[in-house]
């Protein structure tokens, strides 16, 4: 996969570094990292100011190698004519880095009260950073855990408050470009969390415009919610990539779609391209059926068979006369969009569609038919599912699913074993939406463990968890994609992919996760194409899918 971004956890990176460090190459590794960091800053300065000479660069310097990288880079930038300032935040400082920056024309100050440099008040350091062209966040690296503390934490808080509501990278802005050194300080390196965050805020982290990371991307640069603080990610090769092993997180890029998207040949007939069965929509929500059908038809599936109430069937046929209404042989199912059994009494007309969902899901599992289970289907799942069943909840739906599963485990220990995860933060011990949004990877993994299914957790960064530790994190759509019905279109697109590659999906338990990531990528890019830079509707996203796919395949 040519464009794929691979994320490796802190332990993997340290293990890959170890042979080089043992061989005495620590100084060379740091020089490569600092050189790559300085080069990235030079590019930012040229783009913003047209030159490096005279530009102001402030480095927030912590302890250890992260601070050393920052100090060496500041020395290199000073040698290029930049007005470099190193702000030390701790008594401990990387000795070789400090020596290098002192040999240059860079100025060194401290806010930690030590005698290593000129002492300045915290407010002075914040003012210098706020007035700079570039700020380097070199406070914490991959060996740190938790929020930034002490003087560094106060710097992050105060500077972050000044910058939080501003557009830092707009053309002509006088505000600094924040460049994170390896990772934004204070994020959860391996799980993408924001320690200490309340209500989704990024108060304990200085959000970066660019993160220059060394050797390989780290999970926090790809996973939500921390990915929102990383900005654009640049990977600097420092020489240990071959020793990294299996990635912890994968992000597919547009160049990867062609290797996974099913393309028909001259002799391919409609049945070979896949037949998707669709159980979606109700009399109250016929639009969900139309949107899911649109996603599937426009993603190129060979045929769609629709099962549902007459009013929804008529709406589907009006939009897509090629859809066949009625049961029949299918290669995959897409079920549940627009159906909410938790809100419908048994006497409601919706009950017939709910029972249809139950029957189809049982049939799919019994006969090894790949299935997308969305919305209403999530409340009807059996105890265990194969990985070729893909669940597609948003955060609220995943919270409800997990709450129900964990309560069942506590009330039926004889069936599931004693113990298990602790209760949630809700007043009744339920898992809350806020918990899922704060730790998406954790809860998506738990859902996979509890059900056996592949889990696609929808969000600004969509997280996919599959068997054998497979994790994908896709951030392809604009914020405008958060609109009614967009998830129904995604259900149809993914259903089309599963139908087109059904035999392979059943044979290879990891393929469903890869196809789910591809569906999220195409769905997000279709939203961009539907109306670049502006609002979109779900139907417009579906309409943009064919051209989006064509562009990705050529």
Enumerate the predicted regions with their spans:
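Glycine-rich phosphate/dinucleotide-binding loop and adjoining beta-alpha-beta core of small-molecule
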Residues: 2-8, 46-245, 303-476
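Radical SAM [4Fe-4S] cluster-binding motif and immediate context
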Residues: 265-327
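Charged C-terminal helix
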Residues: 319, 524-554
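Positively charged, low-complexity intrinsically disordered leader regions
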Residues: 1-53, 227-267
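Short, small-residue alpha-helix embedded
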Residues: 403, 483-522
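Short glycine/threonine-rich catalytic loop with a Thr-x-Gly-x-Asp
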Residues: 29-30, 66, 225-228, 265-273, ...
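Generic hydrophobic/aromatic pocket-lining and core-packing "Φ" positions
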Residues: 34, 71-74, 289-293, 361
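Glycine/charged-rich beta-loop-alpha catalytic/anionic-binding loops adjacent to active sites
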Residues: 16-23, 55-57, 138-139, 272-278, ...
């Amino acid at each position: 996969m040519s464009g794929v971004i691979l994320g490796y956890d802190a332990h993997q990176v340290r293990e890959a570094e170890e042979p080089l460090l043992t061989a005495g190459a620590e100084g060379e590794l740091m020089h490569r990292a600092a050189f790559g960091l300085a080069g990235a800053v030079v590019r930012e300065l040229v783009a913003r100011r047209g030159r490096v000479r005279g530009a102001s660069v402030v480095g927030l310097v912590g302890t250890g190698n992260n601070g050393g990288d920052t100090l060496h880079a500041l020395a290199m930038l000073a040698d290029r004519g930049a007005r470099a300032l190193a702000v030390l935040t701790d008594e401990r400082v990387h000795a070789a880095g400090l020596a290098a920056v002192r040999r240059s024309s860079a100025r060194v100050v401290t806010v930690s009260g030590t005698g290593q440099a000129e002492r300045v008040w915290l407010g002075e350091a914040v003012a210098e950073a706020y007035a700079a062209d570039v700020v380097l966040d070199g406070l914490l690296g991959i060996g740190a855990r938790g929020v930034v503390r002490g003087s560094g934490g106060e710097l992050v808080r105060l500077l972050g408050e000044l910058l939080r509501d501003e557009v830092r990278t707009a053309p002509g802005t006088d505000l600094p470009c924040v460049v994170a050194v390896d990772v934004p300080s204070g994020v959860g390196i391996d799980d993408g969390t924001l320690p200490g965050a309340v209500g989704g805020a990024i108060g304990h982290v200085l959000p970066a415009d660019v993160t220059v990371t060394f050797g390989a991307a780290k999970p926090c640069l790809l996973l939500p919610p921390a990915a929102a603080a990383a900005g654009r990610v640049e990977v600097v090769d420092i020489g240990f990539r071959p020793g990294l092993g299996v990635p912890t997180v994968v992000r597919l890029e547009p160049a990867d779609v062609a290797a996974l998207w099913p393309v028909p040949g001259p002799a391919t007939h409609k049945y070979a391209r896949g037949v998707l069965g669709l159980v979606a929509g109700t009399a109250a929500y016929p639009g969900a059926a139309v949107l899911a059908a649109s996603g599937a038809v426009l993603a190129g599936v060979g045929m769609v068979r629709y099962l549902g109430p007459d009013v929804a069937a008529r709406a589907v046929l009006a939009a897509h006369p090629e859809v066949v209404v009625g049961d029949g042989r299918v290669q995959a199912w897409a079920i549940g969009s627009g159906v909410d059994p938790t809100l419908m009494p048994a006497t409601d007309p919706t009950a017939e569609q709910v029972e249809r969902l139950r029957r189809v899901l049982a049939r799919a599992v019994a006969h090894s038919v790949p299935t997308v289970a969305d919305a209403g289907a999530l409340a009807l799942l059996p105890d265990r599912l194969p990985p070729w069943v893909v669940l597609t909840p948003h955060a609220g739906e995943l919270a409800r699913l997990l709450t129900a599963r964990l309560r069942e485990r506590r009330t039926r220990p004889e069936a599931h074993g004693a113990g298990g995860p602790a209760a949630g933060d809700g007043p009744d011990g339920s898992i809350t939406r806020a918990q899922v949004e704060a730790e998406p990877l954790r809860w998506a993994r738990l859902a996979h463990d509890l059900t056996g299914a592949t889990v696609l957790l929808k969000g600004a960064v969509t997280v996919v968890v599959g068997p054998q530790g497979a994790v994908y994190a896709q951030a392809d759509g604009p914020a405008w994609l958060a609109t009614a019905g967009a998830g129904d279109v995604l259900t149809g697109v993914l259903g089309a992919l599963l139908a087109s590659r059904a035999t392979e999906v059943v044979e290879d338990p990891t393929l469903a996760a890869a196809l789910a990531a591809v569906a999220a990528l195409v769905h997000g890019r279709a939203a961009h194409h539907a109306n670049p830079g502006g609002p979109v509707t779900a139907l417009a996203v579906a309409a943009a899918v064919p051209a989006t796919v064509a562009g990705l395949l050529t």
